[in-house]
Amino acid sequence: VAHIEIIGKYGLPVVVSINAFPSDTEAEHALIKEAALKAGAFDAVISRGWALGGEGCAELASAIDKASSQPHKANLLYPLEISIKDKIEIIAHQVYGAGTVVYTPEADEAIEKYTDLGYGNFPICMAKTQYSLSHDPAVKGVPRGFDFPVREVRLSAGAGFIVPITGEISTMPGLSSKPVFIGMDIDTKTGRITGLS
């Protein structure tokens, strides 16, 4: 429900995919759909893509198509002209439910540097755990009022983002100009995979 409310703040219609498994009951699916619609979702549909591939996602695709056809205006939570810290704090409070945002000296220094270099109007791309609305993967549910640590702030000038790093998270490395997967292949007749070493 919290995710539906968060996406709604951005002015976007929400479609909830209910991953249906053989042990589920229709009553469980109905309860999930009712809660999703009550929270503001455009629709909530059963998906069996894990079992049926594309065919199992047809209803989901149709719902997404309908939702994307509705009039809506996507928006940021903040104007780009406000300070980097103000943008971080709006996201921390309005999206994650944080109380106080706590910056390390390194994060403060980076924010000042990027602002001085003219990147202060970039949008924010928060790097945090996917396992919690907080910075801490062990904190479940919808926490409120916690301290939200920003330990590092990076500049992604080419992509056009300021990236605050929160909690203990590793960011994805970039790929080389010739990623290893380019040399991988599967022989469709024998099933033999090549190029893994």
Q: Where do the model's predicted regions map?
A:
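P-loop NTP-binding site
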Residues: 1-31, 35-197
